[in-house]
Amino acid sequence: MTEEPEFSLGVEEEYLLVDAETGDLREAPDALMEACKAELADQVGPEFLRCQIEIGTPVAADVAQARDHLARLRGSIARHAAEFGLAPISVACHPVADWRAQGRTDKDRYNQISQEMGGVARRMLICGMHVHVGISDKDMRIDLMNQFSWFLPHLLALSASSPFWLGEDTLLASYRTTVFAGYPRTGLPPRLGSWAEFDRSVEMLTETGIIQDASKIWWDLRPSARFPTLETRVCDACPRLDDAITLVALVQATLRMLWRLSRQNLRWRQYDNFLLGENRWRATRYGSTEGLIDFGSRRILPFDEIAESWLAAIAEDADALDSQPAVAGLRDMIARGSAAERQRALFASAITAGATPQEAFRSIVGWLIDEFRRDL
């Protein structure tokens, strides 16, 4: 396990389509999807609901290339959507939309999920971001997965963008996390001893007909079913491109740091999912505003302190990966506050200025439209 992995990157994002004037959800017209497909081929496609669009970047050698891919994809979809009076937004939950009013995409995989999951699937009006990091050695993938779980609550806290649901403040920073928890085989991954153990577990479920393949395992972090990658799935969709890229860079540099430790026969601190799950809940509830538990010191640390410790741990790796500027964006994200905090602040400001709740929510969607286009 000493040969350095590729640490190549791939990013998947899910977007919502809204009316550019009213901010209401709209289904993607067939002509829009055809135009996107004509330009972007298999890098774009429908998602579970017809108001969603999913993108997947080509493999990127580094963070700069991943940013170029994402900027191109976001820009292309925004341009084509505008021709239909629509706009894409990248956010984990629309603040007011009703999942019961959304049409499902007629696709074999989605039809199967709908049949298997019933009402749970119909509520999936949520969007996330998935980050793939290339690690060809299978046992290394499992070893790094075990250690990287520590950082999953950190990523969720930073990405949290879903405070509202059906026009109500949920008091959570990431309501999406609670919606997705309705699916089986979600949450923190179990600690596994080897690739063979993972393979045996998947085989048990496929042989009994529970799942068709490993793509039906929806942990926050998993070995990809399609690629030689570790796939981080915990993040809410990020409204702003550069925030998404900061998270991509943090995932990549942190995995390299863990690999570097393994070369020295060292490991990152390990705690069971009972304790890690408490930090995951804190991230779901508060985002980055109330800190996370440091189990070694038995204290709740504020997120700016967590960030500086994290950046120090991965500094050598960010240098090696040439991702220092993107990683340093962590400080900017904390200073600005999460997308969940900013949506609440916009709502409160609009209400104070005399807006109705409907108008205040519309201002949030307008901000999300602007954020999507920023930094392209």
Swiss-Prot record:
GO molecular function: ATP binding; glutamate-cysteine ligase activity
Enzyme class: ligase
Superkingdom per UniProt: Bacteria
Pfam families per UniProt: GCS2 (PF04107)
EC number: 6.3.2.2
Reaction(s) this enzyme catalyzes, per UniProt: L-cysteine + L-glutamate + ATP = gamma-L-glutamyl-L-cysteine + ADP + phosphate + H(+)
Matching Gene3D superfamilies: 3.30.590.20
Disulphide connectivity of cysteines: none
GO annotation (BP), single: modified amino acid biosynthetic process
Keywords: ATP-binding, Ligase, Nucleotide-binding
Zinc in keyword set: no
Family: Belongs to the glutamate--cysteine ligase type 2 family. YbdK subfamily.
Functional description taken from the UniProt entry: ATP-dependent carboxylate-amine ligase which exhibits weak glutamate--cysteine ligase activity.
Protein name, as recorded: Putative glutamate--cysteine ligase 2
Organism: Paracoccus denitrificans (strain Pd 1222)
